[in-house]
């Protein structure tokens, strides 16, 4: 029943678009591209294999990653909000939650002296909108996690005149 009503709605949409295109063509006499109804015919044809695949049940595809089992099940992740850059006064990149993996064994490459690792997840940092999203993702993948709560700085009330007060040690002599 839903497929029939969907195709009727699709047919009406296509006819409206075609009518608008024909009206625009007759008014402006400029060549315009007409929307063909082949997509509607394709949707009506139930015997072809080009239909959309619909899955009735939710499938778990986390086991299809190709990452070895030792890197998946024994991981510990840290969920945090990055600190503000000390060199700037802006708060960019401090609103989203980040997830980074623990550090595994590293060694120095004897030829070049570079730091090497066999861990495919060591340099990966994931970004999430909320803490709950990050925690649910870690639980879904079977990782243990530590959550570092967001540190909100307490605003300091200052006045501009305090920079020029004579009774405080705010002025530095140059001699």
From Swiss-Prot:
Transit peptide, residues from-to: 1-42
GO biological process: brain development; electron transport chain; mitochondrial respiratory chain complex I assembly; reactive oxygen species metabolic process; response to cAMP
Keyword hit for Transit peptide: yes
Coiled-coil residue windows: none
Keyword Electron transport: yes
Topology relative to the membrane: Peripheral membrane protein
Described function: Accessory subunit of the mitochondrial membrane respiratory chain NADH dehydrogenase (Complex I), that is believed not to be involved in catalysis. Complex I functions in the transfer of electrons from NADH to the respiratory chain. The immediate electron acceptor for the enzyme is believed to be ubiquinone.
Subunit structure: Mammalian complex I is composed of 45 different subunits. This is a component of the iron-sulfur (IP) fragment of the enzyme. Interacts with BCAP31 and TOMM40; the interaction mediates its translocation to the mitochondria; the interaction with BCAP31 is direct.
Protein name: NADH dehydrogenase [ubiquinone] iron-sulfur protein 4, mitochondrial
UniProt organism field: Pongo abelii
